């Protein structure tokens, strides 16, 4: 799958926050065979020595890095954070987050479009964290985005795909745009469902990091993403409102 001209080895993207230890994080990334890891500038900057150790570990994993603007609530804050992240992580990829509501962490679609326009003009390759809003999606594409990352549910909620209709509509309206379900996924079955809907990748963090065994859960998500993709490519049957016999009646004894 190509994202801004770069082919990723896996359709599973993995966040790097909230793990019990750096060693477990490293093992989880390997178990997931992640195509991308997301990182926060705030973590890198939290302590110079700790930040350097974290960044060194991430580099040693050899996985493409997608910095984010997590925690930003204004356009100015998000743009400033993105520029700082480009300097620190040496990449023009940015997962753009502009939070509009503190309780649900719902994206501010108006601010997101404005920030995406500014950052695209500044040479960034923007991965926008968005709602499943069709009009907002169109505006983000017009602003220069070539990837869309709609939420499945609020960040960290584990509720899965709250609005399957909306996610399916996005896929239908933008068949040629890479789409990634980002946020709210709690179980491997949620990830498989996203792939079955036609999405190109999923981004997981809390569901792996906070699991009782993050490394095994990372492997479970890897297998689920693979299963969902294979199922989609196998042309699954459509739902029916009525039963359809699966056993042939030819040759069956008939009573008068």
From Swiss-Prot:
<dbReference type="InterPro" id="IPR013785">
    <property type="entry name" value="Aldolase_TIM"/>
</dbReference>
<comment type="similarity">
    <text>Belongs to the ThiG family.</text>
</comment>
<dbReference type="GO" id="GO:0005737">
    <property type="term" value="C:cytoplasm"/>
</dbReference>
<keyword id="KW-0704">Schiff base</keyword>
<protein>
    <recommendedName>
        <fullName>Thiazole synthase</fullName>
        <ecNumber>2.8.1.10</ecNumber>
    </recommendedName>
</protein>
<comment type="subunit">
    <text>Homotetramer. Forms heterodimers with either ThiH or ThiS.</text>
</comment>
<keyword id="KW-0808">Transferase</keyword>
<feature type="binding site">
    <location>
        <position position="156"/>
    </location>
    <ligand>
        <name>1-deoxy-D-xylulose 5-phosphate</name>
    </ligand>
</feature>
<dbReference type="GO" id="GO:1990107">
    <property type="term" value="F:thiazole synthase activity"/>
</dbReference>
<feature type="binding site">
    <location>
        <begin position="183"/>
        <end position="184"/>
    </location>
    <ligand>
        <name>1-deoxy-D-xylulose 5-phosphate</name>
    </ligand>
</feature>
<dbReference type="Pfam" id="PF05690">
    <property type="entry name" value="ThiG"/>
</dbReference>
<keyword id="KW-0784">Thiamine biosynthesis</keyword>
<dbReference type="GO" id="GO:0009229">
    <property type="term" value="P:thiamine diphosphate biosynthetic process"/>
</dbReference>
<dbReference type="InterPro" id="IPR008867">
    <property type="entry name" value="ThiG"/>
</dbReference>
<feature type="active site" description="Schiff-base intermediate with DXP">
    <location>
        <position position="95"/>
    </location>
</feature>
<keyword id="KW-0963">Cytoplasm</keyword>
<dbReference type="InterPro" id="IPR033983">
    <property type="entry name" value="Thiazole_synthase_ThiG"/>
</dbReference>
<feature type="binding site">
    <location>
        <begin position="205"/>
        <end position="206"/>
    </location>
    <ligand>
        <name>1-deoxy-D-xylulose 5-phosphate</name>
    </ligand>
</feature>
<comment type="pathway">
    <text>Cofactor biosynthesis; thiamine diphosphate biosynthesis.</text>
</comment>
<comment type="function">
    <text>Catalyzes the rearrangement of 1-deoxy-D-xylulose 5-phosphate (DXP) to produce the thiazole phosphate moiety of thiamine. Sulfur is provided by the thiocarboxylate moiety of the carrier protein ThiS. In vitro, sulfur can be provided by H(2)S.</text>
</comment>
